[in-house]
């Protein structure tokens, strides 16, 4: 009897520790997460997703998009690049000094030391922070994903398998026209794409006077019969709204990087 009771107590204690570590701990750590400030700005991140994008999250979930895509960018580390912004009145001396210095791929301490040398010579510099890693080099995002990126997602669609590319920052890479065409005929937008077409998210309608503004520009064998057009359904519009809301292109305290220029224009066919 004593042995049975001891085993019960041991199992109960083990379960309590497991529950505390795997359930209570994460809830206490992440359950209080809130909006944060963009680095060096008073702007708040993230903004709540628009209504269509919130509905689109449920479409994304319903059709199992997370089975083939992740929304979490990884990162190995950061490097610092020192950039000369002004040579000052001793430009020749500064130029000669720079020719002897390593300016890229530095640690923070190395970058501070190099900047100090250039400043002492009369020049002015900026230190640019650049995230590194396989996902970064693929262009999937400028930094790693953090908890705040998923603040408004319930449930968060992290995914674990990458049959297709990561989508954490896809809203900064493509526009709505591209997304609709990619859903209808993936191969027309991505060469050798293995993604199945989602044509059931579109409908064929008779043209009423003029072509609808959201009609797909289909050609060749994909074109509808004369007098008809192919337009997205509400599910397609909401899904695309959600995909366009997936952006993590702002620097945060937990994931800094230097914004060198305004985002490039979204790709359009």
Predicted feature locations:
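Sec-exported extracytoplasmic/periplasmic mature domains
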Residues: 61-65, 70, 119-123, 168, ...
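Short regulatory "switch" loops immediately downstream of catalytic or recognition motifs
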Residues: 70-77, 199-209, 250-251
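A short beta-strand micro-motif
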Residues: 80-84
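Electrostatic cytochrome c docking/interface patches
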Residues: 34-61, 67, 73-79, 109, ...
């Amino acid at each position: 009897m004593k042995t049975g009771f001891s085993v019960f107590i041991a199992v109960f204690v083990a379960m309590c520790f497991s529950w505390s570590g795997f359930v209570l701990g994460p809830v206490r750590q992440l359950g209080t997460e809130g909006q944060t400030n963009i680095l060096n700005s008073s702007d708040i991140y993230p903004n709540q997703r628009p209504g269509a994008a919130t509905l689109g999250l449920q479409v994304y979930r319903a059709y199992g998009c997370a089975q083939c895509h992740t929304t979490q960018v990884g990162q190995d580390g950061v490097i610092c690049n020192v950039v000369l912004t002004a040579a000052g009145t001793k430009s020749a001396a500064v130029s000669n000094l720079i020719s002897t210095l390593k300016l890229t791929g530095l640690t923070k301490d190395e970058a501070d030391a190099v900047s100090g040398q250039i400043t002492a010579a009369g020049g002015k510099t900026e230190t640019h922070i650049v995230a590194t890693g396989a996902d970064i080099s693929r262009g999937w995002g400028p930094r790693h994903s953090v908890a705040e990126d998923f603040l408004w997602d319930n449930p968060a669609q992290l995914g674990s398998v990458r049959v297709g590319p990561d989508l954490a920052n896809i809203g900064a890479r493509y526009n709505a026209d591209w997304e609709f065409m990619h859903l209808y005929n993936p191969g027309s937008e991505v060469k050798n794409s293995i993604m199945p077409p989602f044509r059931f998210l579109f409908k064929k309608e008779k043209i009423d006077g003029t072509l609808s503004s959201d009609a797909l520009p289909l050609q060749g064998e994909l074109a509808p019969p004369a007098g008809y057009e192919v337009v997205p359904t509400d599910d397609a519009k909401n899904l695309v709204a959600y995909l366009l809301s997936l952006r993590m292109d702002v620097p945060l305290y937990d994931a800094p990087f230097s914004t060198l220029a305004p985002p490039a224009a979204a790709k359009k066919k």
